[in-house]
Amino acid sequence: MQTHDGKTAVAIIGSGNIGTDLMVKILRHGKHLRMGAFVGIDPESDGLKRAERMGVPTVSTGIEGLLSHPDFGSIGFVFDATSAGAHARHEQLLRPHGVRVIDLTPAAIGPFVVPAVNIEQHLDAPNVNMVTCGGQATIPMVAAVSRVVPVEYAEIVASISSRSAGPGTRANIDEFTETTSNAIVRVGGAQRGKAIIILNPAEPPLIMRDTVYCLVPGHADRQAIVESVERMASAVAAYVPGYRLKQTVQFDEFKGRMPQETGSAQAPRLKVSVFLEVEGAGHYLPSYAGNLDIMTSAALATAERIAARQPVAA
């Protein structure tokens, strides 16, 4: 639903790190979006207080307060930045109202969306899931390899600063691995996938670092893989400026067996290794929190793309 200025009003549920950073991004950079409501459950939270200072309508009674808010009818999008468990309930309550839902939890009720890979396939979905921070960073690389050559197995390792992992992130650790592993297959195109997350306690905090391993046929065109990876990195950096390749793509011959394989060793294969780092934009969160920045940036890019298709009110 759009106003005379052509912008769609949105609500954000979740006043923690991710929700607050997303709010700041929309206020500063929203092209087709404007803040309609910022929703939390703790009136003393930094996020709700910051929203009030920035002139954003706030709700401190959770989704029930949002649904009863006098301006709820003008809301076109709801971003859910709470937890996987809470999102299932939120989705049930929101669905009858017909608002579009952008899910930043690992609940995965709607289809997985990684903007650089598959956003055009899900522009009409009522609920889209942003996978996980590790998924947003690494699945584009798996997809970049799989569009050139079949990927038998892909494994991602996401290392994030422990300081950037708030209560929501820690509560969702188990869902992180399951959701990301599923998305490596369903979005990345790998035949099998595995995800590992590391909370790095180092001080001073280190920025997000990700490693992507893909197992491909030994005859794969290495140059084509490199070029595809570099193109994909540029596509992601278009909406996450701090996203970059840490070094050149690495290739190693792999002649052994995977843990689940039996019988004699397979024909020689290649292990493709891609090394990434993600530096945050520093809108609300420190620059080392690239894991949170990539989630909010991907969610914003997704909603902007969907909103851009909607007719402008006269």
UniProtKB/Swiss-Prot annotation:
Transmembrane segments annotated in the record for this chain: none
Catalyses which reaction(s): acetaldehyde + NAD(+) + CoA = acetyl-CoA + NADH + H(+)
Binding of NAD(+), residues: S15, G16, N17, I18, S164, A165, G166, P167, G168, T169, R170, A171, N172, N291
UniProt keyword Oxidoreductase present: yes
Sorted UniProt keywords: Aromatic hydrocarbons catabolism, NAD, Oxidoreductase
Pfam families assigned: AcetDehyd-dimer (PF09290), Semialdhyde_dh (PF01118)
GO molecular-function terms, A-Z: acetaldehyde dehydrogenase (acetylating) activity; NAD binding
Catalytic class of the enzyme: oxidoreductase
Superkingdom of origin: Bacteria
SUPFAM superfamilies documented for this protein: Glyceraldehyde-3-phosphate dehydrogenase-like, C-terminal domain, NAD(P)-binding Rossmann-fold domains
Swiss-Prot/TrEMBL GO biological process terms: catabolic process
Enzyme Commission numbers on file: 1.2.1.10
Entry annotated with the keyword NAD: yes
Active-site residues from the entry: C133 (acyl-thioester intermediate)
Signal peptide: none
Sequence similarity: Belongs to the acetaldehyde dehydrogenase family.
Protein's UniProt name: Acetaldehyde dehydrogenase 2
Biological source species: Pseudomonas putida (strain ATCC 700007 / DSM 6899 / JCM 31910 / BCRC 17059 / LMG 24140 / F1)
